[in-house]
């Protein structure tokens, strides 16, 4: 099983071809392709390749499936004995991203199986 660890949105995510992941919002249209170049680690049949901090020439390519918003997070602040109440909500934007392939130096290391 081949996988890669990428950095996107300030977070590190373990990704595999053929699966989708919810990552921080990307400014790409739905059904648009996007390439992530911040690849920290690649594991395949030949072994593990670790970058310092990134692997030169390694990319993860994928397709944007959907642009969504997460569930609402409520923030409630109150001061006792002061009749002060604040109730606010926040919905974070995120992108549902399907991983198509993992490449190193232009060579495909892993790709999703077309069914």
Swiss-Prot record:
Segments forming a coiled coil: none
Pfam (any one): Ribosomal_L21p
N-terminal signal peptide: none
A GO biological process held by the record: translation
Gene Ontology molecular function: any one: rRNA binding
This protein's UniProt keywords: Ribonucleoprotein, Ribosomal protein, RNA-binding, rRNA-binding
GO CC terms: cytoplasm; ribonucleoprotein complex; ribosome
Function: This protein binds to 23S rRNA in the presence of protein L20.
Family annotation (PANTHER family): 50S RIBOSOMAL PROTEIN L21 (PTHR21349), LARGE RIBOSOMAL SUBUNIT PROTEIN BL21M (PTHR21349:SF0)
HAMAP family in alphabetical order: Ribosomal_bL21
Quaternary structure and partners: Part of the 50S ribosomal subunit. Contacts protein L20.
Homology family: Belongs to the bacterial ribosomal protein bL21 family.
Name the UniProt record assigns to this protein: Large ribosomal subunit protein bL21
Protein source organism: Picosynechococcus sp. (strain ATCC 27264 / PCC 7002 / PR-6) (Agmenellum quadruplicatum)
């Amino acid at each position: 099983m081949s996988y890669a660890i990428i950095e996107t949105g300030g977070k590190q995510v373990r990704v595999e071809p053929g699966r989708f992941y919810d990552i921080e919002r990307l400014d790409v249209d739905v059904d648009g392709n996007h390439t992530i170049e911040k690849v920290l680690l690649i594991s395949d049949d030949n072994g593990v390749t670790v970058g310092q901090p990134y692997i030169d020439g390694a990319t993860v390519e994928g397709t944007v499936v959907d642009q969504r918003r997460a569930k609402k997070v409520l923030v409630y602040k109150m001061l006792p004995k002061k009749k002060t109440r604040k109730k606010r909500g926040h919905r974070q934007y995120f992108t549902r991203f399907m991983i198509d392939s993992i490449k190193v130096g232009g060579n495909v290391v892993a790709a999703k199986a077309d069914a």
